[in-house]
Amino acid sequence: MDENIQHVFLVGAKSLGAYGGYETFINKLTEYHQNDSRLKYHVACKANGDGCMDETKVGGVTGIIKDKDGNTVEFTYHNARCFKIKIPQKIGPVQAIYYDVAILSECCNYIKEYHISHPIVYIMACRIGPFMKLFYNKIHKLGGKVYLNPDGHEWMRAKWSKPIRKYWKASEQMMVKYCDIAICDSVNIEKYIHDCYDGKGIKGTDPKTIFIAYGAETRKSKLADDDPKLLGWYEDKGLTAKGYYLVVGRFVPENNYETMIREFMRSQSKRDFAIITNVNDKFLNKLEEKLHFRSDKRIKFVGTVYDQELLMKIRENAYGYFHGHEVGGTNPSLLEALGSTDLNLLLGVGFNREVAEDAALYWSKNDGSLAGLIDKSDKLNDEKITAMGEKAKRRIAEAYSWQFISDRYVEEFLEK
């Protein structure tokens, strides 16, 4: 392999078509670097199960390689080599651990087989701590380095039981210990890493960290207001421009769908609440049992939108955007909302305030907080909403543009 090319193996995302933070990040990183001959990305994707990669739904895929059974095992996207990892489906939460271990094993085998010089293995999330010393030593023996993106308190996520949370916390400590550098997407996350793990690195060292945020676009969608694709989508979903509040994100408890739906139902708003997500039936039914939201015709689960220009236009035309994430660092969905939607209503936790500052309105999980904010927001005049939008876009352009973020990664990856 050409020693002048920096090979970077990206570990931890499920696919390139999902709404998770890492999926969005990898999509944009490979897009912005696709014509940089100094970099070659290798992206792991799930072959099966929840959130798996379906390359037929993503435009621009080439070089598809299939196995003897006709299943895609490898393809090219944004000039990145994407490879699929199959996972046993009957091992429950252990799937996440199995997935990362299987990816790292495949990465090490590939690096060895193709004699890749000075590879970087960039691991997103802290799931495989007990295996990290083994892989750290293996990758170093192959002449590589281990980079980590600590995902922002995986152990705090509501979906996990107490024993699993305990495992994630211990795993996080080991992951931070056995990495060459931790790239933190939030100043709050970087501070947390040092507060918790200074003096706990190899031979009692402090972890080496840098801050590089996620990015977002500030341009307008290429679709016009009367584009047939947009109008057809609106007709199909029963929505109209500026006639809906919006949320886009993974359908998991810690994103506070329960609070947002309950509070919207309490509000007096005449607008709809459009929810773009990959619905999990178990969680959906649990919410219905608690909230009986199906009786409120304003609440609309509208499925997924893989067309990025259409999704951007849907964001632009939303009256307001809700963001209920309370675990994690800089969230791509929030950045995209600030870059596209004028009025943003955010859960007032540190991570969200760090990103949006005074370019958004904030709510708490207290009863009536969001409902009251929705009713106030419905009464805002156009001038106030436009001013909020301009402020939000300025914030993104100054600190979170994808061009700026991708340039920072080039500097880091190519630093010798």
Describe every region a protein language model picked out:
Residues 164-182:
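Membrane-proximal helix-turn-helix segments that form the acceptor-binding/catalytic region
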Residues 313-329, 342-343:
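Acidic donor-binding loop of glycosyltransferase active sites
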Residues 360-368, 375-382:
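Conserved acidic donor-binding segment of nucleotide-sugar-dependent glycosyltransferases
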Residues 5, 10-19, 31-93, 189, ...:
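N-terminal strand-loop element at the rim of the active site
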Residues 45-50, 216-217, 248, 271-288, ...:
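Glycosyltransferase donor-sugar binding loop
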Residues 177-208, 216-221, 409:
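A short, active-site helix/loop in glycosyltransferases that binds the activated sugar's phosphate group
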Residues 95-108, 118-142, 147-150, 329:
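An aromatic- and histidine-rich active-site surface loop
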Residues 8-11, 229, 234-255, 261-268, ...:
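Conserved donor-binding/catalytic core segment of Leloir-type glycosyltransferases
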